[in-house]
Regions:
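Cell wall/extracellular polymer interaction/catalysis modules
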Residues: 1-139, 144
Length: 144
């Protein structure tokens, strides 16, 4: 299964995107603001939090790229969640529910972008996405 996240609107504090599954539109997303980051981080590959000056903790969208996605247990959510592997500068990046970039903390929030600067119906959208993901073994997400 291939997920694609096309970032289409870059606001002053948030980024809105379209998430597609195998080429078909599925939902909208909201993330933090995009910041220019170095190509790699010497810390996160060793599971040490990023200290790069360009990154603002919990206020920066993840870099563009293609990432492996698996369902992993999240202590915060107390359940399995879609987890992105190998994201430079970031640890613990998930796809989850929320409404604004304040709920993101660097993660990807799914929902419907029918209100400026937020997504709605996020929990219902997440449940539908999760039901599709849990049937798959080989999942990637391309972010551009």
């Amino acid at each position: 299964m291939k997920l694609s996240l096309r970032r289409k609107f870059k606001g002053p504090k948030y980024t809105i995107g379209d998430l597609s599954i195998d080429g078909t539109f599925f939902c909208n997303t909201i993330e933090d603001v995009i910041r220019e980051l170095p190509d790699s981080c010497p810390n996160t590959s060793r599971w040490i939090p990023c200290k790069c000056k360009e990154k603002v903790y919990a206020r920066t969208a993840i870099p563009t790229g293609t990432y492996k996605l698996t369902l992993e247990y999240s202590p915060k959510f107390k359940r399995k969640m879609p987890y992105l592997h190998g994201v430079p500068h970031f640890l613990g990046i998930l796809i989850h529910w929320g409404n604004t970039e304040d709920d993101s903390g660097g993660c990807i929030i799914v929902g419907e972008n029918s209100v400026k600067g937020k997504v709605i119906n996020s929990r219902a959208t997440f449940k539908k996405l999760y039901a599709l993901l849990e049937k798959e073994k080989d999942i990637t997400i391309e972010i551009y």
